[in-house]
Curated annotation (Swiss-Prot):
GO MF annotation terms: ATP binding; catalytic activity, acting on a protein; magnesium ion binding; phenylalanine-tRNA ligase activity; transferase activity; tRNA binding
Keywords for the protein's UniProt record, in alphabetical order: Aminoacyl-tRNA synthetase, ATP-binding, Cytoplasm, Ligase, Magnesium, Metal-binding, Nucleotide-binding, Protein biosynthesis, RNA-binding, tRNA-binding
Record's protein name: Phenylalanine--tRNA ligase beta subunit
PROSITE patterns: B5 (PS51483), FDX_ACB (PS51447), TRBD (PS50886)
Family to which the UniProt record says this protein belongs: Belongs to the phenylalanyl-tRNA synthetase beta subunit family. Type 1 subfamily.
Residue span, FDX-ACB domain: 709-802
SMART domains listed in its UniProt record: B3_4 (SM00873), B5 (SM00874), FDX-ACB (SM00896)
Protein source organism: Moorella thermoacetica (strain ATCC 39073 / JCM 9320)
Cofactor note: Binds 2 magnesium ions per tetramer.
Superkingdom of source: Bacteria
GO biological process: phenylalanyl-tRNA aminoacylation
Length: 803
């Protein structure tokens, strides 16, 4: 938002230097990105009026202009756009132009030129802010400029502009008046609101035009004013100067007035040629299927029923809140103007603007939020200025279709809560005075009842008022204190604590957190080699996707991890060891989609080598170890790993289902080579994904204390021969079950294949620890347990003791 300093001073008595005011605004939460001095790089350039033009006697491409520049001057020019009565910029003898060029009296084919007529480029001006006609020739100054006046003053260049970087919630400051309110609140200076009510003459507008709203969900209010008998022409110098300083190009007096009021009050306006409106009707409706409109930029655009249009009795005449139509454009022949001042739904305007590829100052304001109560005043002010600057007559009354009224917003504010949150000791009277500076109505002595004006749509709760008090009081004046609430973690819900514990455990295991988009494209599922009937193919589709690659909600965290891994690998950032804890989306018919919480991770590359350990590949067992450390840290019990070929995106033979009893928690495995090729990963990679809420159900949230053993343990080794396809975990399960309460611990310490073990078999050796907490075990009890284990292994797994 560009705020010309002189324009700002029209509404608030501010005398601070611009740089100092910029600092105060920034400290109050309105960040000033820059202070731009418009002082021009030229001297001795004045306004002049061309009195006569005569051909050059000896050059067909030159003319001789007799110019009143405070004194009579003869100037020779080759500009194609000069005409008698035109106000121009005249560089006098001795003038200096940008780049150091100095102007002297010169003779052109025997005719003396006592100066030079200047173009926008020669004056160092932004050519986008001058008319297309003036870009190829000399610049035309406003017709009310005085001959001999400083051209820099006429062009509004002796000014300073504050460039504000506004946060999305401060839509009220997308106007000079909004910034003026802030300046008044910060400095205590009085604010002066502009006059709005026009003089009226002639028949009532209600007998000359009608307005109908058929889409009240997209248009809450529509105000119309009628101005008759206008004369289209250039705007006065002051208006053109303000518009240029604010970054807008002057066009004509009527259009300039609508732009001026949009910048002044924050309310976008549109001016229709009243005589070109069929039936003199305004209908605010959705577009019809395939309906088309040619907008002011000359482009024919196809509309759809999701878009809001302004129509007359026959056709759409504007895309609501985005751009007007060419059919009812204000032209030099226009004499009667219908002014539109409306409130359109911001989300609808945003969608329409994006689909049509059209963004404008108006659409930006509607997207951020426009003051619902400000439409009548803006229409009145526009009518008043058109009467003053375009010679029009304002029809009495206005049409105001207000179909969706704003409900007053009143917020309760507790002074003690303010001081608690800020760490201050402000008196309630001080808080009240600070809020009243912002034109908030404050009732009561505490708690206060604070009524919010319509233009402050960002104030919705008590915490917003606390912020307003803090920024006006001064962040730099708030004392440094410890937070008043040091037990926030204890007040977290169990689900929140479990989620945070997952992040801490994954980070402690050496994984870096990533956060990826919740929406992906169908191609991401194709890359995972998923068959058409795979559950992940049933996705939640986005109705209005930004693009095809973001058209469905993710059924898994794996696509996002693959994208991050690919981006890192393409930049040679290896190894990759990442995780994400987030929600996936599962369709549930007509009900709201399910959003289960998942923990997923991916590793790729080799571990860094150290002085006492070699580099190693991040393979299946490396990632399994990470998961085991996470489970151990969070006391997730009874986890088992079962070889599986059920996952088409994992390498057959290097994949496992993670289970707890019969409950499936997730998967772990090396990615299939075809998947690696599809996502262009240069090395083997392994991934896992867990149902994190299910894992939480198994976790021992409160550690269980067990007394240290007082009686000695008995250790025995057991080596058995089993078929080579028998999982070691299955053997351990049988041993644990048969050992009963005597068996305290079991650990696999040797795996062997080869002679003398029979072919097709393997030897597994386990260390068994027997112990009871209340007495010493006898050899007979331990021997009996060993025999039970051997019989169970033989009966259930066909195992035999290794000789």
């Amino acid at each position: 938002m560009r705020v010309p300093y002189k324009w700002l001073q029209q509404y608030v008595d501010v005398t601070l230097p611009p740089a100092e005011l910029a600092d105060k605004l920034t400290m109050a939460g309105l960040a000033v990105e820059g202070v731009e001095d418009l002082t021009p790089g030229f001297q001795k350039v004045v306004a002049g009026k061309i009195k006569t033009i005569t051909p050059h006697p000896d050059a067909d491409h030159l003319v001789i202009c007799n110019v009143d520049a405070g004194r009579e001057l003869q100037l020779v020019t080759g500009a194609p756009n000069v005409h008698e009565g035109q106000m121009v910029a005249v560089a006098l003898e001795g003038a200096r132009l940008p780049g150091g060029r100095e102007i002297h009296r010169a003779t052109f084919r025997g005719v003396v030129s006592e100066g030079m007529l200047c173009s926008a480029q020669e004056l160092g001006l932004d050519v986008s802010l001058v008319s297309p006609e003036d870009r190829e020739g000399i610049i035309t100054l406003p017709p009310d400029a005085s001959p001999g006046a400083d051209a820099a003053e006429v062009l509004g260049l002796k000014d300073v502009v504050l460039v504000l970087e506004l946060t999305p919630n401060r839509a009220d400051c997308l106007s000079i008046l909004g910034v003026a309110r802030e300046v008044a609140a910060i400095t205590g200076a009085p604010i002066h609101l502009p006059a709005t009510l026009p003089g009226e003459d002639g028949p009532e507008i209600t007998g000359l035009a009608t307005v109908e709203i058929t889409a009240p969900d997209l248009c809450a209010r529509y105000v119309a004013r009628l101005v008759q008998g206008v004369r289209i022409g250039p705007s006065p110098a002051w208006l053109q100067a303000f518009l240029r300083a604010a970054g807008m190009r002057p066009i004509n007096n009527v259009v300039d007035i609508t732009n001026f009021i949009m910048l002044e009050m924050g309310q976008p306006l549109h001016a229709f040629d009243y005589d070109l409106l069929e039936g003199h009707r305004i209908i605010v409706r959705r577009a019809g299927p395939g309906e088309k409109i040619t907008t002011l930029d000359g482009v024919e655009r196809e509309l759809d029923p999701e878009m809001l249009v302004i129509a007359d009795a026959a056709r759409p005449v504007a895309v609501a809140g985005v751009m007007g139509g060419l059919a009812t454009e204000v032209t030099p022949a226009t004499t009667n103007i219908l002014i539109e001042s409306a409130h359109f739904d911001g989300a609808s305007i945003r969608r329409t603007s994006r689909r049509l590829g059209l963004r404008s100052e108006a659409s930006t304001r509607f997207e951020r939020g426009v003051n619902l109560e400000g439409a009548p005043a803006a229409a009145d002010r526009a009518a008043r200025l058109m009467a003053e600057l375009a010679g029009g007559r304002v029809a009495p009354g206005r049409i105001d279709c207000y179909v969706k009224r704003r409900q007053p917003v009143t917020i309760e504010l507790r002074p003690e809560r303010v001081n608690y949150l800020l760490g201050t000791e402000l008196a309630p009277t001080t808080m009240k005075e600070l809020l009243e500076r912002l034109h908030l109505e404050v009732r009561g002595e505490g708690p206060f009842q604070v009524t919010v004006p319509a233009y402050r749509g960002d104030l919705t709760g008590e915490i917003d008022l606390v912020e307003e008090i803090a920024r006006l009081y001064g962040y730099n004046r708030i004392p440094v204190t410890l937070p008043g609430n040091l037990t926030a973690r204890e007040k977290q819900a169990p689900a929140q604590r479990w989620e945070e514990a997952g992040r801490e455990a994954a980070a402690a295991a050496g994984l870096a957190e990533v956060i990826t988009y919740s929406f992906i494209g169908p191609r991401a599922l194709d890359q995972l080699r998923l068959p058409e009937d795979h559950p992940w193919r049933r996705t939640v589709k986005i109705q209005n996707p930004l693009r095809e690659e973001q058209s469905i909600m993710r059924p898994s965290l794996l696509p996002g991890l693959l994208e991050v891994a690919g981006r890192n690998a393409s930049r040679r950032v290896l190894p990759v060891a990442i995780y994400e804890l987030g929600r996936v989306f599962i369709p549930a018919g007509s009900r709201r989609p399910g959003e289960p919480l998942r923990l997923a991770g991916l590793v790729m590359g080799t571990t860094p080598r150290g002085w006492n350990w070699p580099a190693g590949e991040m393979d299946f067992y490396y990632l399994k170890g990470i998961l085991e450390s996470i489970f151990s840290r969070l006391r997730v019990r009874d986890v088992s790993w079962e070889a599986s070929n059920a996952y088409p995106f994992l390498h057959p033979g290097r994949a496992a289902t993670i289970k707890a009893g019969t409950r499936v928690l997730g998967y772990l495995g090396e990615l299939h080579p075809d998947v690696l090729a599809a996502v262009e990963l240069p090395a083997r990679a392994c991934a896992f994904e867990l149902d994190w809420e299910a894992a939480g159900d198994l976790a021992l949230r409160v550690p269980r204390y067990e007394p240290l053993p007082r009686f000695p343990a008995v250790e025995r080794d057991l080596a058995v021969v089993v078929p080579a396809t028998t999982p070691a975990a299955a053997v351990a399960g049988v041993i644990r079950e048969a050992g009963g309460e005597l068996l305290r611990a079991i650990a696999l310490f040797d795996v062997y294949e080869g002679a003398p073990v029979p072919e097709g078999c393997k030897s597994l050796a386990y260390s068994l620890v027997y112990q009871l907490p209340d007495r010493t075990l006898t050899d007979a009890e331990v021997n009996a347990a060993q025999e039970r284990i051997q019989r169970a292994l033989e009966e259930r797994l066909g195992a035999s003791l290794r000789q």
